[in-house]
Amino acid sequence: MEEILRLRRSVSIDDYIEKVKPIVEAVKREGDKAVIRFTRDLDGVELDSLRVTEDEFEKAYDAVDDGLIDALEVAKENIYRFHYVTSVERDMKVEFEDCVMGKIYTPIEKVGAYIPGGRASYPSTALMIGVPAKIAGVEKLVACTPPNKDGKVNPLTLVALDIAEFDEVYKAGGAQAIAAMAYGTETVEKVYKIVGPGNIYVTAAKLLVAKDVAIDMPAGPSEILVIADETANADFIACDCLAQLEHDPMAVAVVLTTSRKVADEVEKKVKSEGDFSNFAVFVVEDLAEAFEISNEFAPEHLTVAVKNPEEWLGKVRNAGSVFLGNFSPVAAGDYASGTNHVLPTAGYAKIYGGLSVESFLKHFTFQMLSEESMRRIGGDVVKIAEAEGLRWHAESVRKRLEKI
């Protein structure tokens, strides 16, 4: 197990928090001016303004193939369908012995999304964030995404942001983008929660501002763990591993299999594509051992390529998203099956779930007690309040009991 855990390279996030702190503080003080300065100094991009204009959106549609736009629309429909059907009941009410209680979910009013750039553009992330946010009822949904060297946002990303119904989009990346959304600038809307994946600097900035705004989860490099038996298709598994490894030099791919033949074939295929220090294949005694290891590793993506995979789903305790069978590639979930691809990494699946409609909701509880309810529990409330030394808690109940 230690050998598997070591595949995740240890990075001190505290060091990066210290690096981004001056950036965050400058944006907090100076607003747009600081964002534009850091975009020039760190990214080599000169900007006149931060907000993406309607004209830029129109030109983006002209630059993107119609077939690709149609594909994004299909992905949006599937993402909407899954997230709508699986979202929590908004208004729950119960009654116990004349005491009416309930829980009501309401949307977070303002949310900011970070849409990564850098090594690649990620229009799919716009859909993964925007669709559940709008189902939740977020009133103001904004996004920051890094501009290209010419000061423009990738056209495909802009089209996806428009399809996902974002209200405003800003040309900013890195820690300066996170700070702008956390504290607001002359142009960028101050939000109540920031979501979306990014590099180590983005993650550090999110953790730094988390004392002032909510965040979704810490994010690290992409990862996959595959559990396979002799029925698995080694070529499929190798491709799934390579799909994660192409994201980032620090991405991780692990295969646990009961079949030596599958192990050898997967290893040969992956290594023929490059030397990946964060890739490993292990032969295990049985599937029970594989699931035990997987639950400790808590992978972002878990592929279960075994006979009757659904029968093993109950063994999964910790995973961001699970892909069952030989024909459920991670890429399907990344783009268009309907589940979300903004997922916990680096073992955080032990304590976080992936992005969902609930990520954009908060709840409050309510209660309405009748005189009979007050008579029934009032004496117990007084006893507990007095035991805690809280005189007026007890008195607030005692006064009511006297009137019943």
Swiss-Prot record:
Cofactor(s) essential for the protein: Zn(2+)
RNA-binding is among the record's keywords: no
Entry binding sites for NAD(+): Y114, Q176, N199
EC number: 1.1.1.23
Signal peptide residues on this chain, from the entry's feature table: none
PROSITE patterns given in the database record: HISOL_DEHYDROGENASE (PS00611)
InterPro entries per the UniProt record, alphabetical: Ald_DH/histidinol_DH, Histidinol_DH_CS, Histidinol_DH_monofunct, Hstdl_DH
Pfam name, any one: Histidinol_dh
Binding site residues for Zn(2+): Q244, H247, D334, H393
Gene Ontology biological process terms from the UniProt entry: L-histidine biosynthetic process
Entry keywords, A to Z: Amino-acid biosynthesis, Histidine biosynthesis, Metal-binding, NAD, Oxidoreductase, Zinc
Cofactor binding note from Swiss-Prot or TrEMBL: Binds 1 zinc ion per subunit.
Active site per database record: E300 (proton acceptor), H301 (proton acceptor)
Record pathway: Amino-acid biosynthesis; L-histidine biosynthesis; L-histidine from 5-phospho-alpha-D-ribose 1-diphosphate: step 9/9
Source species, domain of life: Archaea
One CC-aspect GO term: cytoplasm
GO MF annotations in UniProt: histidinol dehydrogenase activity; NAD binding; zinc ion binding
Residues that bind substrate: S222, Q244, H247, H301, D334, E388, H393
Catalysed reactions listed for this entry: L-histidinol + 2 NAD(+) + H2O = L-histidine + 2 NADH + 3 H(+)
Entry similarity comment: Belongs to the histidinol dehydrogenase family.
PANTHER family in the cross-refs: HISTIDINE BIOSYNTHESIS TRIFUNCTIONAL PROTEIN, HISTIDINOL DEHYDROGENASE HDH
General function of this protein: Catalyzes the sequential NAD-dependent oxidations of L-histidinol to L-histidinaldehyde and then to L-histidine.
HAMAP family referenced in this protein's UniProt entry, alphabetically: HisD
Name the UniProt record assigns to this protein: Histidinol dehydrogenase
Source organism of the structure: Archaeoglobus fulgidus (strain ATCC 49558 / DSM 4304 / JCM 9628 / NBRC 100126 / VC-16)
